[in-house]
């Protein structure tokens, strides 16, 4: 009887640890398609490869999400010419109906679409059984690597939110600018001087 209880306790512990796992960062960004209200057209994340991207998942009625969208609008205008792009996806039920009013009200200078919750959870590597706190903000570099991912309860969204977002964007743009260009095939190799 004691052995059975021990086995059950260990199994429960192992399963609970699985559900508490955080997303792996950095990691390669999988493809992600954001639905739009223009029929069958989707926004493919891969079409922004080569740009630094902030992908924000929101609830259109969430005040924290609205505040972050406002900050990201400012950042899009400031950093867009340097290769930065914001993409947004609403994930609430009936999001397809809520997005047009949200866009009209907040007028973000970037695409806003919608997705079902499960596809977003998969993309975020967020366990289905855990609460999803909004907004969810993902920073992707020009090589399509997720460099940072923040949940709505993270200190990142505190009083210094704008400063934190700016620092992430500048880091993405700086890191990708510092990446050396590949040499053409057949280019002579540098010799080490000893």
Residue ranges: model-predicted function:
Residues 1-9:
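Bacterial N-terminal signal peptides that target proteins for export
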Residues 8-18:
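Bacterial N-terminal signal peptides
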Residues 21-45:
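N-terminal "domain-start" segment that seeds a small globular fold
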Residues 44-66:
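Short active-site neighborhood of thiol/selenol oxidoreductases, capturing the structured segment around
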Residues 54-55, 86, 137:
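Hydrophobic beta-strand anchors of alpha/beta hydrolase catalytic cores
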Residues 66-107, 117-123:
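Structural microenvironment flanking redox-active thiols in thiol-disulfide oxidoreductases
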Residues 106-108, 117-164, 168:
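Thiol/disulfide oxidoreductase modules built on the thioredoxin-like
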Residues 177-194:
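Compositionally biased, proline/threonine/alanine/serine-rich low-complexity intrinsically disordered stretches
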